[in-house]
Amino acid sequence: TDSAVTTNRLSSFYRTAEKFGVEIPDEYVMMTRYRDTKGAGEATEKLLDLRRPPTCILYPDDFAALGGIHVIRERGMSIPEDISIAGYDGIRLAKLTVPNLTTLCQDTQHLGQYAAEKLIDLIEKPKTAMRNITIVQGKLYEGQTVLKLDGSRG
């Protein structure tokens, strides 16, 4: 979907890939709605049907990753041996999947506190409120859905 969050995440993704010398083919980037397991499953099918499918799929959230896992397993593929996957959000359910989902966990407590502070500023001082973008650091939860470059799970 086309939202500020999606645009910012995608821009950051492309910048990071470029920094490491990784080129991302346009056909590897597919948009789905957040928490849409069905849409993510359909996008996964399209990616797997490409002449040169990706070796890793990064999903916009953990629920989308669950939709992808379903499609990958239906095709008889193994995660991460045949394809690596990673999610985003760090929901508890990600730690219950087999194998455990590799995911980027957001510090939602810090994010909520920061948002509340900004909202209070906006209410109390509407004339001085400024729009800004804040980057909140995440923490990688290393599940077992991404194959390391040496061939081991990580």
List where the protein language model places each region.
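Bacterial carbohydrate/catabolite-sensing allosteric modules
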Residues: 1-154
